[in-house]
Amino acid sequence: LKSRKNPHFTINLALQGGGAHGAFTWGVLDALLEDGRLAFEGVSGTSAGAMNAVAMAQGLMTGGRDGAREALEKFWTALAATMPASATVAAADGQNVALAPAFKSMLRWANYFSPDRLNPYDLNPLRDLVTAQIDFERLRAESALKLFVAATNANSGKLRLFRLPELSADAILASACMPTVNRAVEIDGEPYWDGGYAANPAVFPLFYECKCPDILLVLLSPLKHKETPHTVQDIRERVLEFAFTATFLREMRMFAHLREYVDKARFPLGRFERRIAGTYFHVIDAQDFMSDLTAETR
């Protein structure tokens, strides 16, 4: 897909989910905010991407660019504090981080017992963190950003997109709900799991509902791996990763096919075709940083 310079320096952001790897996106956003040359119209995020989106929106609303940088730092610092230092150890290669054996054993129970049994009281430290950091009532009333948060209906597999007027702590928790660890988050009588199963992230709302033609994709999942997995655990992790990127890749292929069709058109372009021709994608990916990291680092 083609790219160009946007004379108005306004962009949309599409923020991929990826657990703790979302700290990479925090770094990207911090750099963009510090640079100061870009404005933002819409932000679409899934899971950790959704958390980055609302933290950034909260900060922009209360303190401009500096406020957004402060809000993101505050959020990720508080999130890191929820993980005990004893939970991780240095991996054998000396570069990666691995879970301590005791915590690995705890996670293995998730292969045998549902969240209803492992976590009957549905304890989730993320809930306290999100509600403490984000003023959703004020965000819904005052935010200038168009926000889109993806979750997956646990009964149908369909995408549920929460827009700014619908945003709440439950919507963010739904977008980040791993079904093997936490119970489905119920909203309006429907259960929701992690948005990555349906859109990671959703790009189409930035095309249909925003005027800005430039979309910056911040990707956490490697577009290609160096090695083929061989152990059972590594294969499971690769399959799960593919499940979380398949919908995004399909969506991007659709845009690419439409752009190719429009570029070859022999007829006058309508409004939709002109919008396709005038949409530009830009990518910042974590390939060089994330491709060697194990799933445990998430």
Residue ranges and their predicted role:
Residues 127-137, 169, 173-184, 195-201:
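Active-site glycine-rich loop that binds ribose-phosphate moieties when present
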Residues 1-43, 130:
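Helix-rich "cap/lid" substructures immediately adjacent to catalytic or cofactor-binding pockets
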Residues 3-5, 138-142, 178-189:
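A short acidic-Thr-Gly-centered motif at the start of a beta-strand
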Residues 18, 28, 49, 130, ...:
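Conserved small-residue
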Residues 7-11, 61-129, 163-167, 190, ...:
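Non-catalytic peripheral regions of patatin-like phospholipases
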Residues 40-58:
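Catalytic nucleophile loop
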